[in-house]
Amino acid sequence: MQNLICYKELPVWTAQTIPQGFKNQHNTKAGTWAKLKIYQGELSFAFLDEAGQVQSEHLFTPEQQPPFIEPQAWHKIVSTSDDIECLLQFCCTPQDYLNKKYQLSPTHSEILAATPYLHGGRALDVGCGQGRNSLYLSQQGFEVDAWDVNPQSLQKLQQIINAEGIQNIHVQQRDLNTDPSITGTYDFICCTVVMMFLEAPTVKPLIAQMQQATNVNGFNLIVCAMDTDDIPVQPDFPFAFKAGELKALYEGWNIVKYNENVGELHRVDEQGNRIKQHFATLLAQKLGV
């Protein structure tokens, strides 16, 4: 557990100020470990199953400190002594630190999956949003150019960059529909769940720009919604790939990964279920001439 980082610390609690929610059955989020610190007094603590049945009870003191509470483990504070003083911290792995601290969406799973193939250099995050992928790539040693059309998203990312003293992310407001050109050269260019929000005539010129701006042996990663017979594209998406269309654009590249699997959008239907869509996912490496 030595590699966990505290991203949030609550004020010191007394017997009068421990929130009721922590005395009821609850659990931590995925990827979040909780750590109670006892400064004085005693605290009775129970680990529970999902049904609320007690699995084990423990008495914690300044001499007998609680262990880390694992992500999504059910638990509650049973009781405390009148003189209790304790503090709760939330911790995570280094790669989740900035996302948790600043309440960003997690780094895209395909970025994480591509990491073993990447070896630093310069990266371009096309449609970076608030920076969930750019921040991760900066932690991996990349010099990152982060582009987005939304000034509010870029402002949030710039605030994080300033607060954390990050030197290797450079934000730029770009409207790719009016100008898809890429003038620099990069070892990794990613565009995850962005292209379906672009005007259809923009996408193929943008991909051509991504390809020419990629160094030999560099990688492109694209994830984009598809329009298929079994699951038509969402009506408000200006663009979607047809079957095999994205892969065909990378003829002559080393296709490391390609699939058209069903995934979920963040939006939900009338029943509250996340909407499913086929996604074209491609990780490709540029080969020498």
Language-model regions, residue ranges each:
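Short acidic-glycine-tyrosine-enriched beta hairpin
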Residues: 51-71
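Ligand-binding loop in jelly-roll beta-barrel domains
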Residues: 70-92
